[in-house]
Amino acid sequence: MREKWKALTKRERRLFAAAFVFLASAVLLRFVPGLRFSALLCLCATAVLFIFYLLEHFARRGYRAAAWCELALIAVLLLGFSLFTVLETMVVRGSFADESDEPVSAVIVLGAGVNGETPSLTLRTRIDAAAAYLEEHPNVPVVLSGGQGPGEAITEAECMRRALVRRGVDESRLYPEERSTSTQENLRYSRAILEELGVDPARRVAIVTSDFHLCRARLMWGGDIAAVPAHLPSALYFQCLTVNYFIREAFGLAAYFVYGG
């Protein structure tokens, strides 16, 4: 097997490696739902490598247009990688907890997926982070924000309410917001609830969400917030999920800057 590999040319080895990455990505895409975004990126990278192979093939045959296209593709990739680096840096820098002791006027917990009536892994981590924070801040109102999507028997807000009440949080503090279907709506409708409660949204509020999601939530809120990050467990698989989510969030941040939502 090793002799056959050595007998291959560099171009043949690259094609073989690209085919291997393609197959591995297809397996991840099919059998590991949590890593689908990273698998899609790998598939895209494989496609780009194949395009490079074709352009190089035609460029060596004297097609000048292929050579120019190859240079243009390199320039686009360098620009895209530079933009990704900037966005990813923002996501990472915005993922840390707020260390200030300044009091907050309210807490907003952002929802995530619900499987039937059971919180997803991401939502469980947000509930855990919220429960710990509310124990330390027992006198502030809490808005639980999240509507109902496909496959969800109850709203995300109701799922969070049930879980927090089971953990001993006073139900009278909890104000479900059950209309939202996006982060932007989460914050818009939560702001309206705070105003109804007589809480000035311009005052400092705490926002509980996943660590990778904090940067975008902070930008969308626009005011002074106490960031309360929810983290996935430290096991290797969950850390792979974390990397996947942080990479995906850079694209979500790009969409926010382009579309404003």
Short names for language-model regions:
Residues A26-R30, G80-E88, F257, G261:
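Short hydrophobic alpha-helical membrane-anchoring segments
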Residues E3, E56-Y63:
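Cytoplasmic membrane-interface regions of multi-pass membrane proteins
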Residues T85-I247:
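A structural signal for short, hydrophobic/glycine-enriched beta-strand patches
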Residues M1-A7:
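Short, Lys/Arg-rich, polar N-terminal cytosolic tail immediately upstream
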Residues Q239-G261:
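A transmembrane-helix-recognition feature enriched in membrane-embedded lipid enzymes
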Residues Y63-R64, D211:
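Alpha-helix N-cap/helix-start capping motif
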Residues R11-F58:
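Membrane-embedded alpha-helical segments of integral membrane proteins
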Residues A66-T89:
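Internal/C-terminal transmembrane anchor helices
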